[in-house]
């Protein structure tokens, strides 16, 4: 395997070729940094968190594919993943995970002690998550915690503490993550049932759309509470309205429960997150 082929394999293993997950992690992290700073965050902290999000997203993908390597070959969407297809060995994948994990931890060491402690919890959660799909019908709810963990870390890095405002944002992102990852799970539901992978899409059954809607509404309420705690105004409110618009569109897409529209609904959440971040940033600027 030449260097170009090796890069292609690593890129697919870490999902660098599919940045949607990185973006969905990035928007709430950036929102947390802006809220914690009351505007423009410290540049050093901002750069560390942006790089950290990219690295930890890659780590999460590697450990997820390692855990699912014997199942992914039976699922239409995942059978071409490098570990499932045998393009890379488990030893090489785990080595890459360790290298990236150490790089991320090295970045964290540039910050304060509270962030370091929170980061240890974060890496443990990241490792545990992929295996929850075998023991619970609610892995998306565990993922919501994993994908929201950068929020208390961001507040800790910027202010040295984690105030109540941070936990409102944490709750908002948790509800939102469960909603959009259930849309994602709807894409694989038929295959997951065959191979025994558990998900909220299977758990919710015929009420999946309604429960996703409830989680979207709960996320909205918590985003409102986070903004209210930080005394945000009209432009943040416009961002929230745009979020509602995207959420409504996603409900339309998943109505028929077909694979392609459900995946499109999942991808659309990137724009919902961008709208929230732009609304928040504009509210501080203007």
Swiss-Prot record:
The keyword Magnesium applies. It catalyses: all-trans-octaprenyl diphosphate + 4-hydroxybenzoate = 4-hydroxy-3-(all-trans-octaprenyl)benzoate + diphosphate. Its main location: membrane. Its cofactor is Mg(2+). Its EC number is 2.5.1.39. Pfam families: UbiA. One of its GO terms (cellular component) is plasma membrane. The keyword Magnesium applies. It is found in: Cell inner membrane. InterPro entries: HB_polyprenyltransferase-like (IPR006370), Prenyltransferase (IPR039653), UbiA_prenyltransferase (IPR000537), UbiA_prenylTrfase_CS (IPR030470), UbiA_sf (IPR044878). It is an enzyme of class 2 (transferase). Keywords: Cell inner membrane, Cell membrane, Magnesium, Membrane, Transferase, Transmembrane, Transmembrane helix, Ubiquinone biosynthesis. Gene3D superfamilies: UbiA prenyltransferase. Belongs to the UbiA prenyltransferase family. PANTHER family: 4-HYDROXYBENZOATE POLYPRENYLTRANSFERASE, MITOCHONDRIAL (PTHR11048:SF28), PRENYLTRANSFERASES (PTHR11048). This is 4-hydroxybenzoate octaprenyltransferase. It comes from Shewanella sp. (strain MR-4). The lineage of its organism: Bacteria, Pseudomonadati, Pseudomonadota, Gammaproteobacteria, Alteromonadales. The gene is ubiA.
């Amino acid at each position: 395997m030449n260097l170009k082929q090796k890069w292609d394999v690593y890129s697919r293993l870490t999902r660098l070729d599919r940045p949607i997950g990185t973006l969905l992690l990035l928007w709430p992290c950036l929102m947390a940094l802006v809220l914690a700073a009351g505007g423009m965050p410290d540049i050093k902290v901002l750069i560390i968190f942006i790089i950290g999000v990219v690295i930890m997203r890659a780590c999460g993908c590697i450990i997820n594919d390692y855990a699912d390597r014997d199942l992914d070959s039976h699922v239409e969407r995942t059978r071409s993943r490098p570990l499932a297809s045998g393009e890379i060995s488990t030893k090489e994948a785990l080595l890459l995970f360790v290298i990236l994990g150490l790089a991320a931890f090295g970045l964290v060491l540039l910050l304060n002690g509270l962030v370091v402690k929170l980061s240890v919890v974060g890496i443990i959660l990241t490792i545990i998550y992929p295996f929850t799909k075998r023991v619970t019908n609610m892995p998306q709810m565990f993922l919501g915690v994993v994908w929201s963990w950068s929020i208390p870390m961001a507040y800790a890095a910027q202010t040295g503490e984690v105030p109540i405002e941070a936990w409102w944002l944490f709750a908002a992102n948790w509800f939102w993550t469960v909603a959009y990852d259930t849309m994602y799970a709807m894409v694989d539901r038929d295959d997951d049932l065959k191979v025994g992978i558990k998900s909220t899409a299977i758990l919710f059954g015929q009420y999946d759309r309604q429960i996703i809607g409830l989680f979207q509404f709960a996320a909205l309420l918590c985003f409102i509470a986070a903004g209210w705690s930080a005394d945000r105004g009209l432009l943040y409110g416009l961002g929230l309205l745009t979020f509602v618009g995207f959420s409504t569109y996603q409900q339309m897409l998943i109505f028929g429960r077909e694979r392609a529209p459900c995946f499109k609904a999942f991808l659309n959440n990137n724009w919902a997150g961008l709208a929230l971040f732009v609304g928040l940033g504009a509210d501080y600027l203007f």
